[in-house]
Amino acid sequence: MSPSRNLTAALAVLTALALTSGCTRPTRDPTELKAITEASRLLMKLHPADADIPRARWPRAIARLEPELVSVTSSGVHITTKAYFDGGWGYFVPRRERALPEPVDRFEKVGQGVYWWHPY
């Protein structure tokens, strides 16, 4: 193989590794999910209206997720772990447990009242 082909192959492998390592996945640990739910319920009590929560005020269970943004809305708590042009990836805890987040095809229930959302 020529040196330029070796370089091209190496760059392709490095690009693939970078892209796959950037993909985030939700936790499935029930204890951690329960802590996220409890922390989110506290934030909803403290912020009945829409609010972006400053990093210094994130509860420990949420801060451990290393999110980019935490916001409280009329529908619940959004914990954005990776921003993207159409919303990104993250966790969502609804204000009403039986209220399914919309659009349905972007959300996956991961447990303990926590949903995971992702781009289309």
Where are the model-predicted features located?
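Sec-dependent bacterial lipoprotein signal peptides
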Residues: 1-21
